[in-house]
């Protein structure tokens, strides 16, 4: 019996630190998978190293057609949301998406994110949104991260 208790406790320790991506208000879609290059999903936060570029993808299913898709990114530090400017916010260009997006289909959005040397070494909750032509969130994903 003690052996099973030890195994259960060890499993809780492993899963307690596992990285979780959470939905932050998806309206017309649902993300099914998030993959971040070099991210250790056994940790509570994804480590983003300064002066590198991170590649990632989000798989999602769409419940309504979208004629245009815009990427909006914020970083939340100490409860304060700060916008993250993107060189190309048009998610229909160079991101694996071809607009218009059809309803009841699945898609993979891909992006690269520069982690600049000037960024402070801090824990941040990255809020990644894909918005439709009306500004409604198709998907909204929160990614716990730590800049090092």
UniProtKB/Swiss-Prot annotation:
Listed InterPro entries: Ig_E-set, ML_dom, ML_Npc2-like, NPC2-like
Localisation: Secreted
Disulfide bonds: 24-140, 39-46, 92-99
Any single GO CC term annotated in Swiss-Prot or TrEMBL for this entry: extracellular space
Main location per the UniProt record: secreted
Tissue specificity of this protein: Broadly expressed with a higher level of expression in many tissues, including midgut, salivary gland and ventral nerve cord.
Top-level taxon: Eukaryota
Glycosylation sites: 51
Pfam family, any one: E1_DerP2_DerF2
Matching SUPFAM superfamilies: E set domains
UniProt keyword Signal, yes or no: yes
Signal peptide: 1-16
Keywords: Disulfide bond, Glycoprotein, Lipid biosynthesis, Lipid metabolism, Secreted, Signal, Steroid biosynthesis
Observed phenotype of the null mutant: Abnormal sterol distribution in many cells, also lower than normal ecdysteroid levels. Npc2a and Npc2b double mutants undergo apoptotic neurodegeneration.
GO MF, any single term: peptidoglycan binding
GO biological process: ecdysteroid biosynthetic process; intracellular cholesterol transport; positive regulation of defense response to bacterium; sterol homeostasis; sterol transport; synaptic target recognition
Stated role: Functions redundantly with Npc2b in regulating sterol homeostasis and ecdysteroid biosynthesis, probably by controlling the availability of sterol substrate.
Family named by the database record: Belongs to the NPC2 family.
Protein name: NPC intracellular cholesterol transporter 2 homolog a
Organism: Drosophila melanogaster
Name of the encoding gene: Npc2a
């Amino acid at each position: 019996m003690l052996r099973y208790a030890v195994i259960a406790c060890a499993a809780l320790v492993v899963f307690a630190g596992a990285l979780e991506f959470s939905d932050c208000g998806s309206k017309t879609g649902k993300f099914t998978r998030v993959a971040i290059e070099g991210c250790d999903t056994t940790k509570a936060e994804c480590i983003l190293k300064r002066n590198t570029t991170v590649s990632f993808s989000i798989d999602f299913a769409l419940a309504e057609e979208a004629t245009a898709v815009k990427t909006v990114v914020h970083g939340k530090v100490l409860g304060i949301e700060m916008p993250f400017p993107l060189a190309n916010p048009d998610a229909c260009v160079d991101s694996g998406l071809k607009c218009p997006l059809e309803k009841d289909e699945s898609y993979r959005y891909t992006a690269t994110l520069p982690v600049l040397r000037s960024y402070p070494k801090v824990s941040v909750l990255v809020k990644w949104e894909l918005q439709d032509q009306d500004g409604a969130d198709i998907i909204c994903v929160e990614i716990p991260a730590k800049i090092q």
